[in-house]
């Protein structure tokens, strides 16, 4: 029996590794464009991108570089590719005409829905509708008019049969030749024919399968959607080890092992990877996080700025050196590394979790404690595994993204993950780890997501800095015996319910909250004028926070 998909560490929580930007407004749209480009199967000559005029992309268009991400994805770039920032220039060089349209959207009700309508140089056509669901994760809604949901965790072989000519014997023969089949679906649509989709753990050989795929019949064609995620789903995936801290703690007590060891086992069950691979992968991510927090201070790099994106890290460094700083100790160091995390330097890869760069804010809080307490890299690594477990529970029970649960889902979840990680790092008990996470999340429950276009990263930066800088405080409260009352899963459920009750204008559409204030309206007007007069390649990366 196939196990239903569930969140895992390297796909959902700490991923995708990407260029600076929003995970849901930059990495996600890029990935959907990448799928659309593969569906087309040849270089594009015409790229039409349709966006919901009432959706989130319409509200923030430009300030998060959704446009460059979508176009770059169609050109074949993944979220970690620095060429994304030159997507329009490269599309023009390739002879591809690009247009965007804001319209009524009927194919999806998700606030982060997008439709790609592509024409290729050889005359092929392709349409893909998809949703950016948060944290860089995506889902397809339709491909070439056929309903199909896939999240990029397998290879997907698509067989289109416009005239319904492929018989059962041919289907059976094809399926016998497919390697490591994870799942399949078949759907018919009047006027379009039949689509058969095969989810595979390894890439099929289209050349070898060509006879079976097309069967020499008119109106039959095939395409492959390549995986987007580092961990590819397997047929023998084990069930989810835990979906609450209560269950997680029970396993740790029964097995007499620390929480981080149970977290490693969770990922082994989810991914099928051996223990050594998982630890090495987390260590690699920790290295990327370390560079993101420190590159602006330690490397000879240019920090891209604009009238709407100042060099916050440079300002903080000058202030700290002046002797006038009020914050000191762990808090001052957390601020320093957090500003480094948000520098938005092309080529300095970032690790989301759950928002763009979120893992690096978590790392900033952890690293400040590591410095102050003289802890080892292994101590920090153990904390990251605990943070990943908290993130997996959050993704299981909620949708930690601004478009669904407001800034609670992003800054609030990051704060909970960081508080839990710090408590683990300094030797807290499993109960104290849970209390720290729940206390932190409760403090940030109910926050809207209302990024101000042209508002120098406000109020987003205030919130993530608050969550980051309070993480060690909530760890201390838990260590001192302050009980959270709500177990973590209940705190997540409460935050989810409140977040989903917020009106659309408070869910990353830049239509309400702080965005409705007169000063914010003036910022928007200034930004829109600058955006209209500037070229895409002249704009800094879309690192809002």
Model regions and ranges:
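Regulatory modules associated with amino-acid/nitrogen control
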Residues: 3, 14-17, 32, 37-44, ...
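Functionally critical mobile loop/hinge segments
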Residues: 86-100, 424-545
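C-terminal regulatory domains involved in ligand/effector binding and gene-expression control
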Residues: 88, 129-133, 145-150, 187-207, ...
């Amino acid at each position: 029996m196939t196990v239903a998909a569930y969140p895992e560490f390297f796909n959902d929580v700490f991923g995708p590794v990407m260029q600076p930007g929003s995970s849901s407004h930059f990495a996600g749209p890029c990935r959907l464009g990448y799928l659309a480009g593969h569906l087309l199967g040849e270089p594009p000559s015409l790229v039409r991108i349709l966006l919901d005029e009432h959706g989130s992309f319409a509200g923030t268009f430009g300030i998060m570089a959704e446009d460059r991400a979508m176009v770059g994805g169609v050109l074949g770039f993944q979220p970690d590719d620095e060429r994304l920032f030159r997507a329009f220039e490269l599309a023009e060089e390739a002879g591809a005409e690009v247009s965007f349209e804001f319209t009524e959207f009927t194919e999806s009700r998700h606030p982060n829905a997008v439709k790609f309508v592509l024409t290729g140089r050889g005359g092929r056509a392709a349409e893909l509708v998809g949703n950016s669901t948060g944290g860089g994760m995506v889902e397809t809604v339709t491909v070439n008019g056929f309903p199909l949901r896939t999240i990029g965790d397998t290879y997907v072989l698509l067989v289109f049969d416009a005239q319904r000519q492929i018989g059962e014997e041919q289907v059976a023969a094809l399926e016998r030749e497919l390697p490591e089949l994870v799942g399949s679906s078949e759907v018919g649509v009047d006027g379009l024919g039949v689509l058969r989709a095969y989810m595979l753990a390894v890439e099929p050989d289209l050349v070898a399968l060509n006879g079976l795929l097309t069967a020499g019949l008119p109106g039959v064609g095939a395409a492959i959607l390549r995986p987007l995620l580092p961990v590819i789903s397997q047929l023998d995936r084990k069930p989810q080890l835990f979906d609450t801290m209560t269950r997680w703690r029970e396993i740790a007590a029964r097995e007499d092992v620390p929480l981080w060891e149970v977290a490693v086992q969770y990922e082994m069950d989810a991914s099928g990877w051996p223990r050594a691979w998982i630890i090495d992968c987390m260590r690699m991510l920790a290295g990327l996080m370390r560079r993101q927090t420190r590159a602006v201070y330690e490397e000879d790099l240019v920090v891209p700025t604009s009238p709407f994106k100042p060099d916050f890290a440079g300002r903080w460094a000058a202030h700290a050196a002046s002797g006038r700083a009020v914050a000191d100790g762990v808090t001052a160091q957390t601020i320093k590394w957090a500003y480094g995390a948000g520098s938005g330097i092309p080529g300095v890869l970032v690790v989301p979790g759950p928002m763009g760069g979120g893992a690096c804010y978590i790392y900033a809080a952890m690293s400040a404690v590591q410095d102050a307490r003289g802890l080892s890299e292994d101590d920090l690594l153990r904390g990251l595994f605990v943070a990943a477990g908290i993130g997996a529970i959050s993704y299981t029970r909620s949708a930690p993204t601004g478009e669904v649960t407001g800034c609670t889902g992003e800054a609030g979840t990051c704060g909970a993950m960081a508080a839990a990680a710090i408590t683990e790092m300094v030797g807290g008990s499993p109960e104290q780890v849970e209390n720290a996470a729940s206390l932190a999340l409760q403090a940030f429950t109910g926050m809207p997501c209302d990024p101000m276009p042209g508002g120098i990263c406000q109020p987003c930066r205030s919130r993530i800095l608050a969550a980051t800088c309070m993480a060690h405080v909530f760890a201390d409260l838990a260590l001192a015996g302050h009980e959270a009352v709500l177990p973590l899963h209940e705190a997540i459920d409460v935050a989810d319910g409140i977040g989903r009750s917020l009106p659309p204008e408070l869910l990353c559409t830049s239509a309400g909250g702080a965005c409705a204030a007169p000063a914010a309206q003036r910022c928007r007007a200034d930004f829109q004028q600058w955006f209209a007069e500037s070229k895409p390649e002249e704009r800094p990366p879309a690192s809002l926070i």
